[in-house]
């Protein structure tokens, strides 16, 4: 009904309706301009393939999926049983932190590629590793000296 009332004339006028310039207080600044497009060697040289590593490609993707799927029963079991066990808290904490680390590592790889940021890329990887270790230590302290991960989530959920 709406289409028949508006008709095709409204589609032609749609450019005028949506031609509003967005409000912006800053100009576009290219912080990291793109590198020059160059070819190493000649055009007739054979392509150099990178070294094959099991930490990249399909093995890495499969490991990420296994970690993500392993979290499902670890979250559901304490919810259905209503109780939490320290071993379940430890397993959930390890898989949750590993899942987060792998996700943030993908972000670091995407936004700070090693071929472009030769010094910043390793620094960002080490910052991520340090934050992951600090998170592991913090969750270990929370699980051993406090109420535990699943009880903490339950209290947050009910508050």
UniProtKB/Swiss-Prot annotation:
Keywords: Electron transport, Heme, Iron, Membrane, Metal-binding, Mitochondrion, Mitochondrion inner membrane, Transit peptide, Transmembrane, Transmembrane helix, Transport, Tricarboxylic acid cycle. A ubiquinone binds at residue 111. Pathway: Carbohydrate metabolism; tricarboxylic acid cycle. Induction: Expression is down-regulated under conditions of iron depletion. One of its GO terms (molecular function) is ubiquinone binding. Its main location: mitochondrion. It is a multi-pass membrane protein. Heme binds at residue 99. Membrane-anchoring subunit of succinate dehydrogenase (SDH) that is involved in complex II of the mitochondrial electron transport chain and is responsible for transferring electrons from succinate to ubiquinone (coenzyme Q). This is Succinate dehydrogenase [ubiquinone] cytochrome b small subunit, mitochondrial. The gene is sdh4.
